[in-house]
């Protein structure tokens, strides 16, 4: 594992060479502007022939709501960024949106106790949850659609 500064996409060049990369960008995008996220995706896109990305994002509304209760407030972060439209970030890149995933798939929610099931359904599924937070799958393949 290597520590890199995501706001400096040129550091992607120091990652090991390979044809394929699987990248998990968790808890990262809210610290980067849209153009910085795009720069990071573009650098990954240039480095690898085949790229699979799982990326979580706060929406712009989610960022505003998180000002009141968010662990990042305790570490001195003063500016957060949200993404409402991932395709506006990937437009023109080989990296493209595949689908949106849920952290709480219905099949797993069904395994919870009735009280927990109700709690999860209210807070972590549906329109309210999607208004705050999203989990995206992205892919980039040489010869794929641009």
Please provide the spans of the model-predicted regions.
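Alpha-helical subdomain
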Residues: 1-146
């Amino acid at each position: 594992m290597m520590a890199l500064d995501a706001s400096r996409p040129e550091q992607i060049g120091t990652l090991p060479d390979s044809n394929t990369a699987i990248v998990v960008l968790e808890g990262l995008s809210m610290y980067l502007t849209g153009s910085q996220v795009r720069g990071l995706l573009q650098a990954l896109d240039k480095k690898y022939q085949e790229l699979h990305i799982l990326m979580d994002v706060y929406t712009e509304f989610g960022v505003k709501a998180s000002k009141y209760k968010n662990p990042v407030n305790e570490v001195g972060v003063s500016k957060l960024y949200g993404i409402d439209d991932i395709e506006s970030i990937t437009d023109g890149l080989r990296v493209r949106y595949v689908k949106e995933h849920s952290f709480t798939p219905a099949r797993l929610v069904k395994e919870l106790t009735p009280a927990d099931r109700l709690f999860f359904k209210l807070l972590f599924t549906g329109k309210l949850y999607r208004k705050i937070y999203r989990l995206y799958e992205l892919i980039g393949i040489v010869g794929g659609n641009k």
